[in-house]
Amino acid sequence: MDISKMNRYTAPVNFASLPLLTTFLCGVGLLLLATFTMIQVTSTKYNRNLLKELFIAATSSVFLGFGSVFLLLWVGIYV
């Protein structure tokens, strides 16, 4: 297996777009986290909706997770 004959790996995301992706994904994740927190603080035990809370929490966690990955790539920690 000759390494000089192998194709060079190119990243699926352009490095110039990492700051924008990080800012957008973390911003949306934090906005959803704030929404989830406000729902928890202002709702009573009679008007809570479990599916809505789970959906907002899961969506926030996905956005913050991908935002964190792109933040690590942006600062040079290649995961």
UniProtKB/Swiss-Prot annotation:
Similarity field: Belongs to the OST5 family.
InterPro entries: TMEM258/Ost5 (IPR007915)
Pathway assigned to this chain's UniProt record: Protein modification; protein glycosylation
Gene Ontology MF term list: oligosaccharyltransferase complex binding
GO biological process: protein glycosylation; response to endoplasmic reticulum stress
Key words, A-Z: Membrane, Transmembrane, Transmembrane helix
Disulfide partners: none
Subunit structure: Component of the oligosaccharyltransferase (OST) complex.
Record's bilayer topology term: Multi-pass membrane protein
A Pfam short name: Ost5
Recorded coiled-coil stretches: none
PANTHER family: TRANSMEMBRANE PROTEIN 258
Protein name: Dolichyl-diphosphooligosaccharide--protein glycosyltransferase subunit TMEM258
One cellular-component annotation, GO: oligosaccharyltransferase complex
Intracellular or extracellular location(s): Membrane
